[in-house]
Amino acid sequence: MIEPAIERRHNLALIKTLTYVMFMMFAMTTDSVGLIIPEIIKTFRLSLTAAGTFQYATMAGIALAGLFLGQLADRFGRRPTIVFGLTLFAAASYLFVAGESFPFFAVLLAISGIAIGVFKTGALALIGDIAKSTAEHTAIMNTVEGFFGVGSIVGPAILARLLADGISWKWLYVLAGSICALLIVAATQVRYPRTMKATSETVGLNRTIRALKNP
């Protein structure tokens, strides 16, 4: 009895750590856009307003995923949703190296935003599953914010170093994509907790229909 309990705690700790690192990895790119925009302006001779599309595209993707894809975690499960988001993000990140046009980059940023949004629907649902109390849920979310903050520092720092050495900003996305690939492998190896499919709404609706038929 003791060994399975220890194994469960160890597995849960791995899940939490992976989730924290995933949020940190996403922050590395989303919070580096401010440094990339001046490079985009120089390369494509754009106005600041036009170059701002780099920021809008990512956020629009996140918003669209949150509004229209929020049910994926309940429909397909936490792990598949998280892995799908990570895979989509990794693919978009690697494609930056192949791009040479501003519209192409903007589309990739929108796709990466959708990927982040999909990931977040799965990750936030997972956090709700593994938290045993409101206090624990708050603690996990605070740690997530902390790791996101670390990524917000590390990403721009790496990008600044790349630019100082004359290396294209695209390689930050390659780095993020590589980290993402490692996280995908790790996520497929860890045992995620089982989640019950949401049926309460259906049951409630069926009861209401029966009640209307039999007043």
How should each PLM-predicted stretch be described?
Residues L108-G146:
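Cytoplasmic helix-loop-helix junction between adjacent transmembrane helices
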Residues D31, T58-L67, I153:
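Residue-level signature of mid-helix packing/kink "hotspots" within the transmembrane helices
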Residues L64-P103:
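Conserved MFS/SLC helix-loop-helix module at the cytosolic interface between two early adjacent transmembrane helices
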Residues L18-T19, P103-L109:
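Short hydrophobic/alpha-helical segments at membrane-entry points of transmembrane helices
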Residues I2-H10, Y192-P215:
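Juxtamembrane intracellular "pre-TM" segments in multi-pass secondary transporters
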Residues L14-K42, L46-L48, K120, L124:
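Extracytoplasmic
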Residues F102-F104, T143-R191:
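Helix-loop-helix hairpin linking two adjacent transmembrane segments in secondary transporters
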